[in-house]
Every structure is written in C-alpha cells, then in structure tokens.
Amino acid sequence: VLNYPGNPDGLTYTADELKEIARVAREYEIILLSDEIYGQLHHKGGHVSVARYYPEGTIISSGLSKWCGAGGWRLGTFTFPQSLDWLMDAMAAVASETYTSVSAPIQYAGVQAFRGSMAIERYLWNARRILSALGQRCYRILADAGVRVHAPEGAFYMFPDFSPFSRRLAEKNVLNSTMLCERLLQEKGVAMLPGRAFERPHEELTARISYINFAGNRSLAAGETIPPHQELPADFIQAHCEDTLAGIEAIVDWLEE
C-alpha cells in the first residue's frame, strides 16, 4: 500500500523512487494499492501515479472528499488494470452487500466534479498555492523552535516529532503522544492527533497537525486577486490564515514555557 501525498506526514515520492518501487513490484509480482486521494493537492501540481511505471499491477484509490474540500461527501474510486478484473469483480460484490451504493446527491455532485472545468482547475491551483505557502510557514515556525519536522509537499498535514523536548516534557509529566495532545488541547486549545493513532510507538512524542483551520472562502477569494505567475506576498498567510498560525505559535509557546 502506498499513500502519497501522505497522511499523516504530507510527504510524497519522487519519480525515481516510484520507478524503483515499480521495478521491485514487477519483479516479485506484487499488487500495489496506491492511495492517491491527495494527489490533486500536491503543492506543486506535480503528482505522478506509480501506475505510470507499473500499470499492469497497480490499483489506484482516490475520491472527492479531499481535493474538493468536501469531507462529508464520501465518494471514493478504485481504478483497476484489465489484468485485475477478477479482483475488481470480487470487490464490487462485497461493496454491493456492504453499502449498496453512493447516495444520489453525492452522485450528482460527483458527475460535475469528474467532468472538470476551468473553474475547478483555477480552484485547485489556488488551493495548492495557499496550502504550500501555509505549510512552509508552519514548518519553519516549528523547525526554528527545535521541533523535528519535514516540510510538507502535499495535502495539509505535518507529522512533527517533539522528542528534542522529551526532558522538558517529562517534567510536565508528558510521557507519550496521547498525553502530549491532551495537554496541548487543555492548556492551549490546540487539537492534534497523537502518533499512536498511526501505529507509532505510544512513548514516541509524535503527532499529526492538520493546518486547515482558516477561512477557506476568504483566502481563496484573496488568492484569486494575485496573478498566477506571482508568489503570495509575505503578509498573505498572516492576513488570511491567522488562526492556523496562532495555533502553531501556541505550540511553540507551550514548549518554551
């Protein structure tokens, strides 16, 4: 199973990495399930499916809920190569006995989304530009404070490691990822998901941050006034994503107290 851009870390694969994965999968006849539901939110618009290099053995899973900003509208898709029709038929049989079908309103919305349009392309380009700038800003604040974290490359997640503060956190009686998230929520009002939820060791001081607590409509409208060839000005994120930045800065303040 591949998941990229990834949840919970916002990272992705390079073309060379995908080619190597494809080479190994082909050599050992491995079926790849490539979860690419965040592919449209690759921050540079450069998402490449591993199916390009291993089409005969790759199943692509995707959907509308992420790139459409429609979290409650659950319409997922699986794309199978012809060589795996037998597996597609088996999955369809199980699905028909599990949830029967997608609700009609979601199907009508899905038709419009999958048809595509220039308006959708403009929305995606604008969303990527904002998420990229905001992700880099959040990354820089945490990294400058000494938190171990990768700069996100897609989606809207980061997976920071607070172990450089383990001694200080132990003095606060914060000994695992659950305690870390509970204390930050109680004391600073910042909600994160503990690393334990992603099968990380409980004592590991990791957590997922989802940096989307901002006014999407307002930021998208403001972004559309800036020409496509220009980067967002330095004050754009501060002006339109202030709640997210306040949350990240609250984490740093809490670590330094």
Residues covered by each model-derived region:
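Conserved core segment of the aminotransferase class I/II
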Residues: 56-132, 136-142, 228, 234, ...
